[in-house]
Amino acid sequence: NSAGQERECPVLMREIGMNAVRLRVWVNPEKKFCQFSDIADVTAKALAAKQAGLNVMIDFHFSDWWADPSRQETPAEWEGLSLEELKVKVAEHVRATLSSVTAQGVSVAWIQIGNETRNGMMHPTGQLWNDQGDLPGGWTKFVQLYMAGYDAAKEICPEAYVMPHLNHA
């Protein structure tokens, strides 16, 4: 901190006036490049945030790595699944994550379904458009995937605000 004292990050955040954290969760990050942002890591960080007096937002990427406008990769273990199967996986992942976090006594204030989803999520199934234009059924598929996450989120955290994340919106 400014006095030169070492502090845990959530404690320091609270001391300097922050009041919330946004924690991303990936499906299987070890399949890519790191061991962070899986359910166990997010649960530990959410508990530390709660103990520091911070509100918690959970940001679901539905990917094994960063999901952004140029990269909305379906998790490796979910590749090749049908839309119906993906909806089940989305709901299971949301339930498992939020159940783990809330089991630690953490109240989740906000839940973000997808990250920077202006062109959908979990491509190609949830993709909205490509260089040739809008994809047939793109919005319908995206909304179904989003609602699978939304419904699961409200099941575990009925008081939380649930939202999409649209960059450039």
Residue spans for each PLM region:
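Aromatic-lined substrate-binding rim segments of carbohydrate-active enzymes
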Residues: 5-70, 75, 134-163
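Alpha-helical scaffolding within the catalytic cores
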Residues: 3-11, 96-97, 168-169
